From Swiss-Prot:
CDD domains: PTS_IIB_lactose (cd05565). It holds the Pfam family PTS_IIB. The EIIC type-3 domain forms the PTS system translocation channel and contains the specific substrate-binding site. The PTS EIIB type-3 domain is phosphorylated by phospho-EIIA on a cysteinyl residue. Then, it transfers the phosphoryl group to the sugar substrate concomitantly with the sugar uptake processed by the PTS EIIC type-3 domain. This is PTS system lactose-specific EIICB component. The chain crosses the membrane at residues 31-51, 65-85, 104-124, 133-153, 178-198, 223-243, 283-303, 340-360, 382-402. Residues 9-410 form the PTS EIIC type-3 domain. Signal peptide: none annotated. One of its GO terms (molecular function) is kinase activity. The gene is lacE. Its main location: membrane.
Length: 570
């Protein structure tokens, strides 16, 4: 029964993979990744300014203003900045389809998108200048609009050579200025015209109009059905081999960051912060220890199973999973594509967000009002993100207990199967391992498990003799770090001239030319055809990995070195 259900879900995989590679969704995601230092930096000052309130201490107004200035001057302009970073990412995607001698200037598109955004989101101040009310999270949807219009117009002009052409004698940097003049002017005229139409028709700026238009959707998304569908999709997509965040995160990005600011404003006013859909909810409630709410799973594998293999996988997975990097348990067990774990893998995140919503609406716990790094351990993220209240400790403990209850019966069934294999009563399920390997890049997890003695593969010496720089890419940089670390450790141990670095897909365009090989982790393997256009143009080798394969490579440094060598032999 479960096998048939999974097979039906997998039939939609090609469509959802195509959706995850959509250049506009990717531009939104990568635009936020580029702006993440601003978002995280600003949250530090929120914590300093308002966490002491929990313990009865309040800064005086002057000191509060000093502490809040870094927040207001960074997060308060985040939409303005994201307009530029989103335009840059989208420009990179369009440039892949253009001739290398006729590319769109991403610096120009960034400037045009940011200038255009000001027309759409700012109002004139009485004493000159302009107001910034919609330049923060309230203006994110408008930032996307400005970025998309900008790059589409630039692409139209550059592709058709609608530019001012200068004599060959003119230096390239001067010639580029005139080449950008027509598309830049067209963007500003179009967005200014839109601004005039909206202001005269609805007596508001475009950003305010868009916010009012989508307000019912934001409200509905925060309801029981909304959070169930949105956060259930994360785990469902991941289970069948699709990187769910690539689809879901861009669609809800504006809601999550707007809700964070709304919650903060409510707390400032002494009211209850009740917005559910936030980045903190996603990272510390729904993906509590990684997609599938797997924080408890490695501990359960260690302490609640009888199989030697399961115990070893649990021990190897505990530390990375505690910090939100759960590939070792996802692909090492495996949990993904494993019919036994389908129900708990999808159900646990949904139940977690239901419990959180009950705590917010019934018990009065404040929802998340600050952005924290995704590698913050789940329980600590809950406590810090919700203001260190007593109920936050209770919530963290409750989620741990509930997730154990959800996973326990399925773990016992799976452990029984593995025990039968170990004792020779049942043949090893190589089909499942091969299926995971075919759908996920498991190198990172393999490396971790190998280092812990889980892998049976013998290592072989590497024949790499020339300096080789390797870039490992995953969705956010955490998973890729496992393989990069395994490569660097093995290279040092065996004196092989390999240097590896980890990165997030989308933030790689400006650095990829420094590497001879790029390896895609399973999370981003579906982007292989897109990035291959870039690597072929630059003469860089490209390799993608699958789930079980990636885990194996992260366990075994020598195997990872062999994998690198094989890419240059093929």
């Amino acid at each position: 029964m479960m096998q048939k259900l999974i097979a039906q879900i997998e039939k939609g995989k090609p469509f959802f993979e195509k959706l995850s590679r959509n250049i506009y969704l990717r531009a939104i995601r990568d635009g936020f990744i580029s702006a993440m230092p601003v978002i995280l930096f600003s949250s530090i000052f929120l914590l300093i300014a308002y966490v002491p309130n929990i313990f009865g201490f309040k800064w005086d107004k002057g000191m509060e203003a000093i502490l809040m200035k870094p927040y207001n001057y960074t997060m308060g302009l985040v939409a303005f900045l994201v307009a530029g970073t989103t335009a840059k990412s989208l420009t990179d995607s369009f440039n892949r389809k253009l001739e290398s001698t006729n590319q769109i200037n991403f610096i120009s598109t960034m400037l045009a998108a940011m200038c255009g955004f000001l027309f759409l989101a700012s109002d004139p101040a009485k004493d000159g200048g302009f107001l910034s009310a919609f330049m923060g999270t309230k203006g994110l949807l408008t930032a996307f609009l400005s970025a998309f219009v900008t790059v589409i117009v630039y692409n139209f002009c550059v592709k058709r050579n609608i530019t001012i052409k200068m004599p060959k004698e003119v230096p390239p940097n001067i010639s580029q200025v005139f080449k950008d003049l027509i598309p830049f002017s067209a963007v500003i005229i179009i967005l200014y015209a839109l601004d005039l139409v909206i202001r005269n028709s609805f007596k508001s700026n475009v950003a305010e109009g868009i916010l009012k238009l989508f307000e019912p959707l934001f409200t509905a998304a925060d309801g029981w059905i909304g959070v169930t569908i949105i956060f259930g999709a994360f785990a469902l997509f991941w289970f069948v081999g699709i990187h769910g965040p690539s689809i879901v995160e861009p669609a809800i990005a504006a809601i999550t960051y707007a809700n964070i600011e709304a919650n903060f404003k409510l707390l400032q006013a002494g009211e209850h912060a009740d917005k559910i859909i936030t980045s903190g909810t996603q990272m510390f409630i729904v993906t509590f220890g990684g997609t599938g709410a797997t924080l408890v799973v490695p501990f359960m594998f260690m302490w609640m199973t009888k199989s030697k293999r399961n115990k070893a996988i649990g021990r190897a997975s505990v530390v990375p999973t505690f910090f939100g990097v759960n590939e070792p348990i996802l692909f090492g067990a495996p949990l993904v594509l494993n019919p036994v774990f389908f129900i708990p893998f999808v159900l646990a995140p949904i139940v977690n967000v239901w419990i959180f919503k009950l705590f917010v609406e019934v018990l009065g716990i404040n929802s998340f009002s600050v952005n924290l790094p995704w590698t913050t351990p789940g329980p600590l993220g809950i406590i810090m993100g919700t203001g260190f209240g007593l109920w936050s400790f209770v919530l963290a403990i409750t989620l741990i207990v509930v997730d154990i209850i959800i996973y326990y019966p399925f773990l016992k069934v799976y452990d029984s199967e593995i025990l039968d294999e170990e004792e020779g009563r049942k043949e090893s399920n190589s089909d499942l391992k091969e299926k995971v390997a075919a759908n996920f890049d498991t190198k990172k997890a393999d490396s971790i498990l190998a280092a812990s003695g889980v892998s049976d593969d013998a290592a072989k010496a590497s024949n790499i003799t020339e300096q080789t720089n390797v870039l490992v890419l995953c969705a956010g940089g955490g998973t890729s770090g496992l393989l990069a670390n395994a490569l660097n450790k093995a290279a040092e141990e065996y004196h092989v001239p390999v240097k590896a670095a980890a990165g997030g897909y989308g933030a790689h365009m400006d650095i990829m030319k420094e590497y001879q090989l790029i390896i895609l982790a399973p999370q981003v393997a579906s982007n292989y055809e897109d990035i291959k256009q870039d690597t072929d143009r630059l003469g860089i080798k490209l390799a993608k990995t699958q789930g079980a394969e990636y885990i194996k490579l992260t366990r075994d440094g020598q195997a990872a070195l062999d994998f690198v060598q094989q890419q240059f032999e093929n």
